[in-house]
Amino acid sequence: MGMLKEFKEFAVKGNVVDMAVGIIIGVAFGKIVSSFVSDVIMPPLGLLIGGVDFSDLAITLQHAGEGVAEVTLRYGVFLQAIFDFIIIAFAIFIAVKAINTLKKKEEAAPPPAPPEPSSEEKLLAEIRDLLKQK
């Protein structure tokens, strides 16, 4: 039972839960970026280059034959993956920069002034001072 208890404590710690949420959001964000690159960015870019569909770009090393599969280097798909990575890296950079800016603002803010002592606290302080004098 000790190991189960330790696992429960580990699993419900804030860092583990935060990390799990971050991974789930990251996977979903990755799918969005992949779709954005392949469906929005690459078609106009291919059109500008001369009607090229990047996903079809490949170098055939061996043509298909009887019982032999075609061997190709699909460098167009690789280029799309590079665009995915660049966009995801840039988005993460912007997010981290924004978070760091917010943290600096929180650190730079002066701590709030202590509240003015209540009338009871002032009276108790006066009594304390009078007792010290005697």
UniProtKB/Swiss-Prot annotation:
Membrane-spanning segments: 16-36, 76-96
Keywords for this protein: Cell inner membrane, Cell membrane, Ion channel, Ion transport, Membrane, Transmembrane, Transmembrane helix, Transport
Gene Ontology cellular-component terms listed: plasma membrane
Membrane topology: Multi-pass membrane protein
Tagged with keyword Lipid metabolism: no
Family membership noted in the UniProt record: Belongs to the MscL family.
HAMAP family: MscL
Protein's recorded name: Large-conductance mechanosensitive channel
Source organism: Thioalkalivibrio sulfidiphilus (strain HL-EbGR7)
